[in-house]
Amino acid sequence: MIALVDCNNFYASCERVFRPHLENKPVAVLSNNDGCVIARSNESKALGLKMGEPIFKKRELVRRHNIHLFSSNFALYGDISKRVFDIVSKNIPAYEIYSIDEAFLDFRGIKDPYAFAVHLRRKVKQWTGIPISIGISYTKTLSKVAGYLAKKSPEGVCYLQDKKHISDILGRLPVDEIWGVGMRYAIKLKKYGIHTAKNLLECDETWIRKMMNVVGLRMVRELKCIPHFSLEEGRSMKKSICTSRSFSVEISDYTRMSEYISMFASRCSEKLRGEAACARSISVFMYTNRFKPKARQYSGYFSMDFHTAASDTITITKLAIECLKKIYRSGYSYKKAGVTLSGIIPRNQVQLSLFDSADRKKADTLMQTLDKINGNMGRDILKLSSSGINNKWKIGKERLSPCYTTRWSDILSVRV
């Protein structure tokens, strides 16, 4: 049996941990620069606040219902995530951390999976303050279905074992709620009269493969209780790493934009080294403010490959600037830009290229020194000059909560 652990409304729940008075009150977390909604409590969802919605469009709703807004605090969320999964992975033969708020657990050998899940859920809530849902079934895809139902259950746990019951559930499950069926596939399937998971199971497998490729076919077989996706033990390797920002003040100067792109590339490099990984390609994108239809509109994107998969800041930043030069156009005011690293592989799997003249050992030593100094003394104590000497590069976060668990100055004091 496979279990899916899913932290409920994770970012919003993290903000509530240290503010218990917000329990049962509407809470929402905003993206960088406090631009869009990226997490909502159930109360905020009930009020009609939607994911990805620009918050300036909902000022009246926020005021009328006193929705509590928070700037995203990823240092806090990442630390609480680690605490949650340290607890759930104990006494489990294998587990896979799928995302910051989800993990798959191997429940083989557990005599009473439902009772174990109920106990685990209570333990996580008691030890961290984070509510979780647990879905249990034969495969990863079915555990996702069980997790979807667990969120609607008062107990927060759903165990799908009886195959007739599973068939009944799939007959009511909307096709767009299946793991791996995004909006594009859902629209396409509905055109063929496929509205539920059971409708999809009744289709010919050759047709499914043609419509949804081999991954889609495996997903459908998993709905039939046939395992196809094994656990990738520990923490899954990210497929891509992106750093991007919506600018509070639009950028219309190349030098300023190149400083931001340089800093984005540096951030991506740090994250990459934190994963003990290297990237094979890089892309840069930028675009104007689409919410100003009367302004001149432009969007640019360019991608390049490294000769050899890289993780050092200097190599990555150089190529990021090359990409920027390909797409930058004068005369526009840019609202958002970003850098994405893709083709990510473990550092120990990198194959050297004949065309690579860089001294890899020297670069690795330099990056280790840079990371150590910045880790001990504070971020950007050492940085590339291309990111701006006097550029403080501060993200607009007017509603940022303290880093209660990762910064000594923010630790709560208790009076006894």
Residue ranges and their predicted role:
Residues 111-115, 293, 345-352:
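Short, charged/polar, Gly/Pro-enriched secondary-structure boundary elements
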Residues 177, 187-333, 349, 415:
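DNA-contacting surface of Y-family translesion DNA polymerases
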Residues 98-102, 137-140, 277-281, 332-336:
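Short Gly/Ser/Thr- and Asp/Glu-enriched loop/turn motifs at secondary-structure junctions
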Residues 103-108, 301-307, 350-356:
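Short, hydrophobic beta-strand segments
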Residues 1-221, 225-227, 270, 360-416:
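Gly/Gly-Pro- and Ser/Thr-rich, intrinsically disordered tail segments characteristic of DNA damage-repair
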Residues 10, 33-36, 289-292, 344-348:
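Short, charged/polar surface micro-motifs in flexible loops or helix N-caps
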Residues 137-139, 287, 340-344, 387:
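Short loop/turn motifs enriched for small/polar and acidic residues
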Residues 321-376:
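C-terminal hydrophobic structural anchor segments
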